[in-house]
Each structure stands twice: as structure tokens, then as C-alpha cells.
């Protein structure tokens, strides 16, 4: 695409110099051309996961949960939370012991602890994360095709500095039939914060969705869903390069079909 844009630029310049077309027509052509002529000329990642193979030197590493390559589908994860047995359901617990546990604050504390551990276990069970150590310029363009099997869960892609849980940006996509959402997050020394949010999106399950995310050298960011611009915002918190790309999944079933990351 960039080669075509460069060639179009050359033809427009030649037509302008030769006065071969109306001035307004030339300006209109430049306006269309500028929509596709970005500063991201260097390809950092170019993956077609549907062929069942990782690209050479891609260095993807699973950090948590499970991701699998499936020919025709892509990089797939459908790790689901395991239900924990309800407190007191064990057949080995006698009625006398159960009655004793019902007495006083000891039982209350035990219940609170059990609920907390169960929630933590569920969160870990349906979470999956994969990352690749790649130097990404501060200005970047990410283009991802995602197969969404249901309306459950959320998928996240981002760039980081240091380690996959380190400082950087995250784009969080949650499918939904009229209640989907896209969040742009910043992870910094003070924790996680929302830069911008768009909700009430129509992003149905059992469909393929395309996410595009660009960042310019001055920190302007744009996010598109299926060719439609959803968010336009700016953040200048990070001025250095990023050291990797991370993808996280929480619940649901998602498959990354194609992923392209470009830089300057």
C-alpha cells in the first residue's frame, strides 16, 4: 500500500508542476492521499497466523494461560474459568463439622477467605497472555484482524517498556451487540488510567473484526474498528521506544488471524 501511495504522490506532484489538472482537483487528490500516507514505513511484525506457523524471528512467548496456532483459524485462546466447589460441599465433611463451622466469626472469616481465593482463581483460570520482544518506535501503526467467537470476555493488545506488564499503552476491546467497548489505557508509574473510552459499540460475536491503531510522533492516536474511526485522542506520556508487544485475553474465545505492526 505504501508503494502505491508513494507512486500517487509522485504523479500528483508531476501533474501539479505541469498544470495538467485543475488546482482544486489536485488539492482534493492530496487530501485523499494524506489519509493513507503515514510516517510508519518500517515493518516490525507481519504475521499471518492462519497458516499455522509463527513468522521467523517473531519470538512470541506465552506468559500465562494458553495460546494455540490453528491452521485456518489463527492464534487461538479459549481458556475458560473453572468453577470452584461450593464451600461445605465436600462429602468428607460431617454434619457436626459443618454445624461447628457455622458458629461465630471463625466461619465468617473462612467464608470471606474462600470467596476471595475463588475469585482470584477464576481470574487466573480464564486469563491468557502472550508477548514478543520487539523494538517498536514511539510512533507506530498496529493492524489486527480478530476472530471473535462470542460476546464474552475481552481482548487486549499493547506496547510496553521493560516487561509485558510494564509501562506503555493498551487497547482493550470488548465485543457486544450494541454494548461493546474500546478502551485506551496508559500504564505508568502511578498505575493504570483510562485515556479515552468508547462504549455502546456494535461488535457482534461469531464475526471477524479489524482493529487499527496509530500513534504519530507527537502523540496523536487514532483507533478504528472495521474501517470506522472510533477514537481520536492524544497522550505524550512516553517519548522513548517500546521494547515489546503484548496480547492479553480475559474470558471468551478469540483468535488473532493477522497482525501487522509498523514503525518509523
Positions of PLM-derived features:
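Beta-strand-rich interaction surfaces with strong enrichment in secreted/lumenal proteins
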Residues: 34-35, 127-134, 196-203, 246
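Short, exposed beta-strand/loop patches in secreted or surface proteins that constitute
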Residues: 60, 64-71, 171-175, 213-214, ...
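Short strand-turn-strand beta-turns centered on an Asx-Gly dipeptide
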Residues: 224-229
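Flexible glycan-contacting loops in extracellular carbohydrate-active proteins
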Residues: 233-261
